[in-house]
């Protein structure tokens, strides 16, 4: 009896340990954040929730709470984040990224015979010169967060942001959405690569900042398109995507395809 009681006590402690944790997960592209939650929930057979979503097109770091660990997620709300993204200035979509729903415009890139510019973008019959790195840097400098001053940038109409108690994407699906602006914080940027029409950036931003908004705004300022074709979250607060080892994982079936979610338990 004593051995059985000890075994039951040990089992209860072990189960409590397993079902009270935070996980850092790698979300793959082209599945939803809720698909990630579903796979992890099935793996642990416990309630699971997240500290913030990623767009279906995006990949990278997601923080999940498992079991009693869901109560710890409130401490992660509002943390700064960093991303790597690629903006395509020859593309314009209704979602501001490659996961367009109904509207997609692609503009032709034309090689230049002029010495002062490498190429042009052909848009609505006009030839728009490819912007220089200096032009792009000046624009990004102008929206950096300074002296507690946030900048107003256009919200993507296809977003989960609520307006008048309703998600914006619901009106967007009906063609009724209006472009709204929202205060956003951009702390720092680094230009990783630029070969027109593609611009690759690393961005450090405040919570609630839409990277799609930055890409679209840049394109509008330059008279070009501006849609994300790649987006990866690389950090949330002190948690880094690079800290996740590709060893511990959960598998699940999403729309007939097996997907793998790699994760690491975080110390609370």
PLM features per residue range, with description:
Residues 1-2, 258:
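Short, intrinsically disordered low-complexity segments
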Residues 3-4, 13:
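Polybasic, lysine-rich low-complexity intrinsically disordered segments
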Residues 10-268:
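Catalytic/RNA-binding core of pseudouridine synthases
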């Amino acid at each position: 009896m004593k051995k059985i009681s000890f075994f039951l006590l040990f089992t209860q402690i072990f189960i409590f340990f397993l079902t009270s944790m935070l996980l850092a997960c790698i979300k793959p592209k082209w599945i939803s954040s809720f698909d990630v939650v579903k796979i992890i929930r099935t793996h642990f057979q416990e309630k699971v929730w997240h500290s913030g979503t990623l767009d279906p097109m995006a990949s990278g770091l997601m923080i999940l709470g498992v079991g009693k660990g869901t109560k710890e997620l409130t401490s992660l709300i509002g943390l700064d984040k960093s991303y790597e993204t690629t903006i395509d200035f020859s593309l314009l979509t209704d979602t501001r990224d490659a996961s367009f729903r109904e509207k997609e415009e692609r503009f032709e890139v034309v090689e230049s015979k002029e010495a002062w510019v490498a190429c042009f973008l052909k848009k609505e019959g006009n030839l728009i010169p490819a912007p220089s790195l200096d032009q792009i840097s000046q624009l990004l400098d102008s929206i950096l967060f300074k002296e507690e001053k946030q900048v107003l940038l256009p919200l993507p109409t296809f977003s989960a942001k609520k307006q008048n108690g309703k998600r914006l994407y619901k009106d967007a699906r009906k063609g009724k959405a209006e472009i709204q602006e929202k205060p956003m914080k951009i702390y720092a940027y680094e230009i990783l690569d630029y070969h027109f029409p593609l611009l690759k950036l690393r961005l450090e931003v405040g919570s609630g900042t839409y990277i799609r908004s930055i890409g679209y705004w840049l394109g509008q300022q330059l008279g070009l398109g501006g849609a994300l074709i790649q987006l990866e979250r690389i950090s949330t607060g002190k948690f880094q995507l690079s800290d996740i080892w590709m060893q511990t994982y959960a598998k699940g079936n999403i729309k007939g395809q097996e997907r793998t979610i790699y994760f690491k338990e975080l110390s609370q």
